[in-house]
Amino acid sequence: MPKGDIVLIKFPFTDLSGNKLRPAVILAVTEMDLTVCFITTQLQWLEATDVQLMLNSLNGLKKPSLIRTSKIATLDKSLATGLLGKLSTNELEDLNNNLSSG
């Protein structure tokens, strides 16, 4: 799973009260962990450092979405349940730029 892959993962709530299965984009992979940004369809939450994703054949998403660069987590690989798709070259470039400017 390289950087830019979109996976389904059990993502914890920020208050740790539970989790939700949601898409996330991989930022880094180690032997046991994945570092990811979560993806949301709540377009009204748009922040300056978010990356907007439109539907395309590459990403496997069902709705227009946002990569929330402010929502980064390192999670055990076992929480990832499936590969949805991957970011396009332009989307990955936008993600890298937004991560470094945030």
Predicted segments, located by residue:
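Short, charged beta-turn/beta-strand-edge "cap" motif at the junction between a beta-strand
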Residues: 12-16
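Compact nucleic-acid interaction/catalytic patches
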Residues: 17-20, 26-57
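C-terminal terminal-subdomain/extension
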Residues: 58-102
